[in-house]
Structure formats: C-alpha cells, structure tokens
C-alpha cells in the first residue's frame, strides 16, 4: 500500500512537468509568430498576382467616403506597400526550415508579381499612367528594391527592368503635394540613381531640403508647413528621408551636398532613434498603441521607424533588442492573433482592429492597409541575430506600470548627442 502511495505521488509530480514540457514544445517563438503573420498577409496577394489573378480575386473594400478616384489604385497600393515591408525578409538565403520554405515561396511569387505589375499584357498590369496616387505606391515599390536590391531587383529580366525604369521615369508628370509626398518623388528618383538609370537630382535634393526645413525638433518632422500629430513620421517621413539620403550621400560618405545644406545622413538617423524611443514608450503594458491621427487603419505601419532601427542595427542605447522585440511582438499578437483583420477572402479588411470601415479616410481602400507590413522589417535579420536571440525584456511602459525601475525620458537636441551609430 505504501508503495502505491509513492507511485501515485510520483505520477502527480510528473504530470505538471510533462504538461509544461509539452507546452514549451508547442509555444511559438517570437520570430515564428512574426513569420506566420507576415506570410498570412502576403500569400493571398502574391499567390494571386504571380498568376495574374489579383484583380480578379481580391475582395476590394473602399472607404464609405471614397472620393471617386479609380478604384484600380487598390491593387498598386496593396502590392507596393506589401513589398516595402516584405523585402528585407526575402533577402535572406534559402534554407530548408519551415520559415525558409515560406520565404522561398513568397520570393518566387514576388518576382513573378513584379513582372506582371509592369507587363501591359498581364491582367494585373498596374495603374501606372492615370491617377496621381500612383506616385505614392511606385515609391513603395522603389523602396522595396532599395531594401532588397540584390534579391528582388537583380533577378528581374532585362525587359522587366526596362519597364520599371520607364514607368518610374514617367511619374515625373506628377506634381507632388507640398507634404510627405515630396519624399515619394525623392524615393523613386533615388532608386533610379542606384540602378544606374537617368535620375533627376533636383527632385531628390529639393525634396530632402524641404523635409529638413520641416524638422520641428525632438525627433519630429512637420508633414508640410503645418504640424499634424499623427503617425506619418513613421509611415513615411523618417524611413524615406533616411533611405533617400543614404543613396545621395553614399551612406554618409559625402557629408556635404552643395544644394542640400543641413541634410545629414547620420543626423537623420539620430533623429529617427529619438523617434524610436518615443514609439517604444507609446506601447502600453497590454500591447496597445494610442489611436490618433489620420490613416490609423494602417495598423502596425505606425511602428515602421522602430522596425527600421532594429533591422539596420541602429537601436539607440536606451532600447535593448529584447525589449523592442517583446513590445512589438505583443502588439502584433494583439492586432493579428485572432484573424479579425482579414476579410473572408484572406485580404486585410478596412478598420483598425477588425472591420471598422467608418474610420477609414476618403482615400483609403483595403489595399492601402498593407502599410501594416512595414512593422516586419526585422525579419530581414537572420534567426540567430541578437534581435531574435536576446532574452525578452519588459518594455518601458510595462516596467513603469508594474512598479519597476525604468529610465527617465530626455528630449533630443543635436548638441547633446548621447547615442551612437554602428
């Protein structure tokens, strides 16, 4: 009888251990969570477009206040914005892991989709030559090539490359609005410059000079002459300003460009670092972000600047890999964990967290929403990079609200540089 008691006791002690062990085996890593969401977002777009079927099969949603522009802008917005966020991940080499197989499939689809996008004979030839909106999403396509030049631009056949250069060049017909749109012209021309095609240096330098004039301090730029408190510093301004500067200054090797006084590549990164600190502090202990400003339906696109800093190994000393990854993961899980942000055909649905078409702006369609992919830039880091392998840590607001010690915040001014650039 005594022996039976010991056996029962041993079984009781072993059950929780086995349960915990099984749970650990089934729990997904942060990277696996990111990969699964990115694949779910990208696969319906690229699997269809690679076959010339995106226009046929995409379940399109337009804002209730749609302004009447050609709804075919939807497909270019969808493809361009998706690729700007997806490009770094597709730059990694092939391997036989589940992630590697996902990535290889997406890259194969993407290369076919790039070709269809500029092939007039393809049903998925995009709306290049009508709406001014085309400039915006051509810039995101150009950005995808800048971010993954060797993996996504170089493999394209010569005819496809010539078609892109022709379409990008033709966009000089668009007079960009006096706002972040200047960066769309600068990004397209910067790509042409990198690709060795004729580029308009004035469109680059004048745009960057104006963005520099609109810097208001402490990591914030004004989106045009009047400041607006929204996420456009992350959606567009910091990333595209840095990436255009990177091309024209050769990553800071040319410190002074004659007609661009004040435009400094390294200083632009330092400002982005300050803005990244602000973004990290905006993430609540529960993994939510403040809902303010226009285009809030772009969801996790609001984190692009933080994602860019992580991907390029530019995180400031205030932010560790573990805390940034943990904070971004909890936001991604909260936003995409239950599938509510996808419609019945698998495409993103109008809303912030679920189907909420009433909050979309007059220019918004569900292709616009693929800005959400821009948070996933760190997937361009290998799985063994410290961003992915460092232990998870509590992020700033989580520490603060749980009564832990946390760092004080300080405004950033050029004369008080405290953070380094690798």
Residue ranges of model-derived segments:
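Bacterial Sec-dependent N-terminal signal peptides
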Residues: 1-25
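CBM-like carbohydrate-recognition segments
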Residues: 47-70, 123, 331-422
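Long, charge-dense tracts
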Residues: 98-99
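Beta-sandwich/jelly-roll carbohydrate-recognition scaffolds of carbohydrate-active enzymes
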Residues: 84, 91-93, 420-421
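Low-complexity, Ser/Thr/Pro/Gly-enriched N-terminal "stalk/linker" regions
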Residues: 23-78, 84, 88, 108-113
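Non-catalytic carbohydrate-binding regions of carbohydrate-active enzymes
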Residues: 263, 267-361, 387-403
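Aromatic-lined, polymer-binding surfaces characteristic
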Residues: 75, 86-89, 103-255, 261-269, ...
């Amino acid at each position: 009888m005594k022996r039976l008691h010991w056996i029962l006791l041993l079984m009781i002690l072993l059950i929780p251990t086995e349960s915990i062990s099984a749970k650990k085996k089934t729990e997904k890593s942060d990277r696996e969570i990111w990969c699964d969401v990115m694949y779910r977002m990208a696969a319906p777009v690229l699997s269809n477009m690679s076959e010339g079927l995106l226009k046929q099969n995409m379940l399109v949603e337009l804002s209730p206040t749609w302004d009447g522009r050609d709804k075919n802008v939807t497909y270019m917005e969808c493809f361009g914005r998706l690729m700007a966020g997806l490009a770094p991940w597709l730059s990694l080499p092939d391997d036989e892991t589940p992630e590697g197989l996902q990535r290889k499939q997406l890259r194969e689809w993407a290369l076919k989709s790039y070709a269809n996008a500029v092939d007039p004979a393809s049903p998925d030839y995009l709306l290049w030559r009508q709406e001014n909106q085309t400039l915006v999403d051509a810039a995101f396509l150009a950005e995808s090539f800048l971010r993954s030049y060797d993996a996504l631009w170089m493999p394209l056949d010569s005819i496809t490359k010539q078609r892109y250069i022709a379409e990008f060049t033709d966009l000089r017909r668009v007079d960009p609005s006096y706002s972040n749109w200047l960066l769309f012209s600068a990004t397209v021309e910067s790509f042409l410059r990198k690709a060795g095609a004729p580029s308009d240096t004035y469109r680059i330098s004048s745009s960057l000079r104006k963005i520099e004039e609109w810097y208001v301090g402490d990591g914030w730029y004004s989106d045009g002459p009047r400041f607006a408190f929204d996420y456009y510093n992350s959606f567009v301004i910091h990333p595209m300003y840095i990436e255009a500067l990177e091309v024209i200054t050769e990553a800071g090797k040319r410190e002074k460009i004659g007609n661009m006084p004040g435009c400094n590549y390294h200083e632009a990164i330092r400002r982005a670092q300050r803005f990244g600190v602000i973004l990290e502090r905006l993430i609540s202990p529960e993994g939510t972000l403040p809902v303010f400003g226009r285009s809030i339906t772009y969801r996790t696109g609001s984190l692009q600047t933080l994602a860019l800093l992580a991907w390029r190994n530019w995180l400031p000393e205030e932010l560790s890999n573990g805390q940034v990854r943990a904070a971004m993961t909890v936001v991604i899980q909260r936003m995409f964990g239950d599938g509510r942000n996808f419609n019945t055909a698998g495409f993103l649905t109008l809303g912030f967290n679920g189907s909420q078409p009433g909050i979309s702006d007059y220019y918004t369609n569900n292709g616009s929403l693929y800005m959400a992919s821009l948070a996933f830039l760190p997937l361009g880091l290998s799985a063994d990079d410290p961003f992915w392998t460092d232990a998870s840590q509590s992020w700033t607001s989580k520490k603060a609200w749980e009564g832990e010690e946390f760092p004080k915040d300080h405004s950033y001014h050029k004369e008080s540089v405290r953070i380094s650039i690798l």
